[in-house]
């Protein structure tokens, strides 16, 4: 059984993703996407692509006494839009494809992750204030102990 003080599914998911999502810039060049959890994303000097992991809804205790939990995380993909405001769909789709294989039905530490079957993703949207296009992948988690 897990204690409330150990309830950090975002850290566990970050561990699964860190260093494993690559962005192909050209045939010769690629880079690794940076991963941020809530409260860690800087306000300046963000890369052209990055991923943010945020809590998405409530955490539910599945047992009495408490010890087994379930919840959701939003995994938000950010990609700097082209100069005309259109999305770099190939890059976003590449990131999404990698996330699907890294996250769906995977465990890290005391947590199990799967893509939420009832609310998989949100469509690509553009934020003119930031210049980024985003897509959100909804991930369910539960504790394994």
PLM regions with names:
Residues 30, 36-39, 68-72, 95-98, ...:
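Secondary-structure boundary/capping motif
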Residues 44, 61-70, 125-130:
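Short, surface-exposed loop and linker segments with low hydrophobicity and enrichment for Pro/Ser/Thr
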Residues 22-27, 46-49, 96-145:
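Acidic-leaning, charged glycine-interspersed low-complexity segments
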Residues 66-83, 131-143:
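Oligomerization/assembly interface segments of phage tail-like spikes and tubes
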Residues 3-7, 86, 90, 127:
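Charge-dense, low-complexity intrinsically disordered segments
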Residues 13, 17, 51-53, 71-75, ...:
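Generic low-polarity alpha-helical segments
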Residues 1-65, 108:
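Small/polar-rich, solvent-exposed N-terminal microdomains that initiate assembly or binding
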Residues 64-70, 78-104:
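Extracellular/virion structural assembly segments
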């Amino acid at each position: 059984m897990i204690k409330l003080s150990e309830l950090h599914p975002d850290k566990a998911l970050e561990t699964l993703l860190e260093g494993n999502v690559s962005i192909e810039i050209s045939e010769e060049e690629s880079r690794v996407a940076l991963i941020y959890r809530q409260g860690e994303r800087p306000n300046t000097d963000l890369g052209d692509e990055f991923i943010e992991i945020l809590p998405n809804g409530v955490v539910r205790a599945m047992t009495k006494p408490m010890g087994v939990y379930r919840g959701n995380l939003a995994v938000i993909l950010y990609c700097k839009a082209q100069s005309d405001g259109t999305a770099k769909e190939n890059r976003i789709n590449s990131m999404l494809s990698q996330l699907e294989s890294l996250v769906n039905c995977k465990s890290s530490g005391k947590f199990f992750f799967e893509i939420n079957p009832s609310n998989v993703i949100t469509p690509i949207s553009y934020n003119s204030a930031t210049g980024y296009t985003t897509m959100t992948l909804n991930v369910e988690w539960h504790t394994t102990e």
